[in-house]
């Protein structure tokens, strides 16, 4: 769930649930989110009902969230498996972000500063995967997940 505007080719309900800031704040106040955070004026969060429904169906749930959100999840689900995706370097991360051509210069700089702060918190995660090669990182993540099944 997010309050940011959809990017080109993103579909509501598939990529994210796009909502207004008022709707998001109502979800926070009602305790409907398992985690949430704010970045550059936009809110991002995960509805509890979405996660609970999947878990009750016996499914595993994969969340792509930032460090504070992951900490909130672990507080609520202590046996959650956490994996920190470590970029090869901040220079490479910058190259990747700029390559998307979806962010202003200000947001690129904010993303890099946030990444530098988050990289220092990798020890909060059960696993760290170095994301220098997509295929290798994907295989390593799959192996970690298989070890818990």
Write out the residue ranges for each language-model feature.
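Conserved nucleotide-binding/hydrolysis micro-motifs of P-loop NTPases
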Residues: 2-6, 67-69, 87-92, 134-135
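ATP-dependent small-molecule kinase phosphotransfer cores
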Residues: 2-61, 68
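A short acidic, helix-capping loop that chelates divalent metal ions and anchors anionic groups
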Residues: 5-11, 92-95, 101
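Residue-level signature of catalytic and energy-coupling elements of molecular machines
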Residues: 24, 62, 115, 129
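Conserved phosphate-donor/acceptor-positioning beta-strand/loop module used by diverse small-molecule
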Residues: 61-66, 75-99
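NTP-dependent small-molecule kinase module
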Residues: 79, 95, 99-103, 117-149
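Glycine-rich S-adenosyl-L-methionine
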Residues: 105-113
């Amino acid at each position: 769930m997010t309050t940011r505007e959809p990017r080109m080719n993103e579909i509501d309900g598939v990529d994210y649930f796009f909502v207004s800031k008022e709707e998001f704040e109502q979800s926070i106040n009602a305790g409907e989110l398992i985690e949430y955070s704010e970045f550059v004026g936009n809110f991002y969060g995960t509805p509890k009902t979405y996660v609970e429904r999947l878990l009750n169906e016996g499914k595993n749930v994969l969340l792509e969230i930032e460090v504070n959100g992951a900490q909130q999840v672990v507080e609520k689900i202590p046996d959650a498996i956490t994996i920190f995706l470590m970029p090869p370097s901040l220079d490479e991360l910058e190259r990747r972000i700029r390559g998307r051509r979806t962010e202003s210069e200000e947001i690129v700089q904010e993303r890099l500063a946030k990444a530098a702060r988050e990289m220092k918190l990798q020890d909060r995660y059960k696993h760290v995967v170095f994301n220098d090669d997509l295929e290798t990182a994907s295989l390593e993540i799959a192996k970690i997940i298989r070890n818990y099944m």
